[in-house]
């Protein structure tokens, strides 16, 4: 039941061979006699086996929204997303865990690097993040539902602006059904949270350049926009 060939620093609810005591159980013929608690035997005149917490190498899987809307704004959301992914990946390898990074393009998941462990391998592979092209749209649920996401072996991280009509909650539920911890990071720019544009404006959909809008941006539109942003942020925050 070992999740990897290398021991990790994450303690699981499974019993294993670490040094941290977890519980007792009755001795059964064939058990490792070195794990018998002889002090307990002297007290209760019954054989008990010491159980220890299993330390496993977990697998962190990071999914980056590579849609064109992420390549927007001062400081670019894409750059922030890559920094966050690099940081989480580094923390994972420092915990002696494996890490894989994927880019979500449209309704597909594309490998950036897979199964990286150790700082040396991390330094060799992390530059591949710069090869991600942010273009088109992303449909998180469509991409993740058919993907191999692992089972009960670590953390799944989704990094996105979540500016989508996609029912991404289905993807979160799917990951949870695979007994994975799920962490969502929403990346938005200050302009998206508090737009400064006013007056007559020509707007376009960054993920579909055929969709354009001409609007006179007034206080009412800004107020409606802010309510929409609050819905988008609260939707992922409260799920």
Residue map of PLM features:
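Exposed, interaction-prone extracellular/peripheral surfaces
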Residues: 1-10, 26-31, 40, 49-83, ...
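A positional/architectural concept
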Residues: 15-17
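N-terminal juxtadomain amphipathic helix
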Residues: 33-35
């Amino acid at each position: 039941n070992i999740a990897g060939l290398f021991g990790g620093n994450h303690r699981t609810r499974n019993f294993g061979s670490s040094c941290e005591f977890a519980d007792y159980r009755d001795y059964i013929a064939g058990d490792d006699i070195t794990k018998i608690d002889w002090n307990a035997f002297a007290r209760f005149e019954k054989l008990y086996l010491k159980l220890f917490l299993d330390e496993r190498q977990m697998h962190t899987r990071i999914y980056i929204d590579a849609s064109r809307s992420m390549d927007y704004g001062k400081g670019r959301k894409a750059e922030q997303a890559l920094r966050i992914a690099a940081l989480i990946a580094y923390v994972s390898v420092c915990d002696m865990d494996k890490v894989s990074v994927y880019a979500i393009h449209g309704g597909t998941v594309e490998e950036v690097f897979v199964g990286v462990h150790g700082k040396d391998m991390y330094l060799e592979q992390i530059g591949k993040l710069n090869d991600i092209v942010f273009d088109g749209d992303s449909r998180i649920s469509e991409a993740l539902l058919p993907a191999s996401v692992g089972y009960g072996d670590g953390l799944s991280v989704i990094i996105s602006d979540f500016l989508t009509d996609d029912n991404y909650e289905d993807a979160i539920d799917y990951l949870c059904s695979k007994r994975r911890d799920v962490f969502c990071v929403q990346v938005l720019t200050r302009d998206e949270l508090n737009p400064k544009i006013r007056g007559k404006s020509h707007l376009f959909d960054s993920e579909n350049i055929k969709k354009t809008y001409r609007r006179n941006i007034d206080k009412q539109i800004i107020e409606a926009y802010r309510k929409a942003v609050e819905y988008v942020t609260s939707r992922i925050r409260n799920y």
